[in-house]
UniProtKB/Swiss-Prot annotation:
One of its GO terms (biological process) is pantothenate biosynthetic process. Signal peptide: none annotated. Homodimer. The gene is panC. This is Pantothenate synthetase. Beta-alanine binds at Q61. Pathway: Cofactor biosynthesis; (R)-pantothenate biosynthesis; (R)-pantothenate from (R)-pantoate and beta-alanine: step 1/1.
């Protein structure tokens, strides 16, 4: 595995790989690697001959009250995990390399970026979309793999790549979960033992909603309210949002229509830690 920190060098390597007709896959991360990231790598390796991983804690997608400086950065451990996972190139630029003096360009992903995560974290998706486009330009991949856990992010990336004719295939990978259903996340390490137990309420809410849909209920607004009550039954839980959305547009959905895809999305604060989760389904 080769470690590269210079964007120009990474771009030069990627261009050479393309000339050699290598099919390139990329997995973009902010480090603090866990099983969720490794599942993305596994999928990328199944699809691509050469896999690049980026590790970059992007400051432009953190709000003023968020955990940029607190965000874990166990770089040596990440390098070991990336190497053992079979990564070919690890791209780990500095902030100064990605945003040099005079940098002024940013991407506005449109209305979908102002809902839910976008409403709770103003500016987050603009910063995310900008760095994703930069990383696509630097690594020149044919395929990029992103996790379904960040479902709104995935929808925005697909929109941006389509709108800007970037030509990279965007592949969503299933959510990796712990044995009790909690979605794997770099932020899980912030949870105390009590909070870790309380966090299982998110997955229990998903299971409850799934049971209701299986029974044929279409009243999504009522199901979401019941699922939220289940989350609130745990102490110190504060949902930012918990609702169903149209899976394509991320507009709030109140009643299911046969033949359409929907997603239950949620963001819940447990103590000082904010967790997200979701579940997608096709309504029959």
């Amino acid at each position: 595995m080769q470690i590269i920190t210079d964007p120009a060098e990474m771009q030069k390597i990627a261009e050479k790989l393309r000339l050699q007709h290598q099919y390139i896959g990329v997995v973009m991360t902010m480090g603090a690697l866990h099983e969720g990231h490794l599942s993305l790598v596994k999928l990328a390796k199944e699809k691509a001959g050469t896999v690049i991983m980026s590790i970059f804690v992007n400051p432009t997608q953190f709000g003023p009250d968020e955990d940029f400086h607190r965000y874990p950065r166990p770089f040596e451990k990440d390098v070991a995990l990336a190497r053992s996972a079979g990564i070919d190139y690890l791209f780990a630029p500095t902030t100064e390399a990605m945003y040099p003096e005079g940098y002024s360009t940013s991407i506005d992903p449109g209305p979908v970026a102002t809902r839910f995560e976008g409403a709770s974290r103003p500016g987050h998706f603009g910063g995310m979309a900008t760095v994703v486009v930069k990383l696509l330009g630097i690594t020149r991949p044919h395929l990029a793999v992103f996790g379904e856990k960040d479902a709104q992010q995935l929808a925005i990336i697909r929109r941006v790549v389509t709108d800007l004719n970037i030509g990279t295939t965007i592949l969503g990978a299933p959510i990796a979960r712990e044995s009790d259903g909690l979605a794997t996340s770099s932020r899980n390490i912030y949870l105390s033992s009590d909070e870790r137990q309380q966090a299982t309420a998110l997955y229990r809410a998903i299971l409850y909603a799934g049971e209701q849909i299986e029974q044929g209920r279409a009243d999504l607004e009522a199901i979401a309210a019941e699922a939220e009550e289940l989350v609130l039954s745990e102490k110190d839980t504060q949902p930012d949002y918990l609702c169903f959305v149209d899976d394509a547009t991320f507009e709030r959905a109140t009643k299911a229509v046969p033949g359409k895809a929907y997603r239950l999305i949620m963001a819940v604060r447990i103590g000082s830690t904010r967790l997200i989760d979701n579940w997608r389904f096709d309504y029959q």
